[in-house]
From Swiss-Prot:
GO cellular component: small ribosomal subunit
Family listed: Belongs to the universal ribosomal protein uS7 family.
Designated name of the protein: Small ribosomal subunit protein uS7
A single GO molecular function term of this UniProt record: tRNA binding
Length: 156
């Protein structure tokens, strides 16, 4: 990491279909090897499947899923006198969003459906109903933080 200055944050433009910045960030995380059009078709295809299955606006389901996956607290390692403690700390809002997006996509990639579009739509539907691997990941992180609550006074 550079000590001189932090890299300036780049502006993320809203996606063309919904005009939402979070959808663009999600799309960029789905993207492999700079293939944005492929990522776009996967995400929009998943949204179309969600709309067909639930008869609800897909953006609402997506936002609900992301809310259910974003962690509020996590543990970070802190070395104190030869021992390493897992110290629970609150998660900043930007990191919450990034972790939520990352966990949703990782969980979707690990599913058994045939295409990525189907996997993503199924994981988003599960997450919006508080089920699925992404929600389980959030619960595991919260459990770790709760188990190490005794070390919260080592917070920095």
């Amino acid at each position: 990491m550079s000590r001189r200055h932090a890299a300036e944050k780049r502006e993320v433009l809203p996606d063309p279909k919904f005009g939402n910045i979070i959808v663009t960030k999600f799309m960029n995380s789905v993207m492999y090897a700079g293939k944005k059009s492929v990522a776009e078709s996967i995400v929009y295809g998943a949204f179309d499947l969600i709309e067909a299955k639930t008869k609800q606006p897909p953006l609402g389901v997506f936002e609900q899923a992301l809310d259910n996956v974003m962690p509020t607290i996590e543990v970070r390692s802190r070395r104190v006198g030869g021992a390493t403690y897992q110290v629970p700390v609150e998660v900043r809002s930007t990191r919450r969003q990034a972790l939520g997006i990352r966990w949703l996509i990782t969980a979707a990639r690990g599913r058994n459906e045939k295409t990525m579009t189907e996997r993503l739509s199924a994981e988003l539907l599960d997450a919006s109903n508080n089920r699925g691997n992404a929600v389980k990941k959030r619960e595991d992180v919260h459990k770790m933080a709760e188990a190490n609550r005794a070390f919260s006074h080592y917070r920095w």
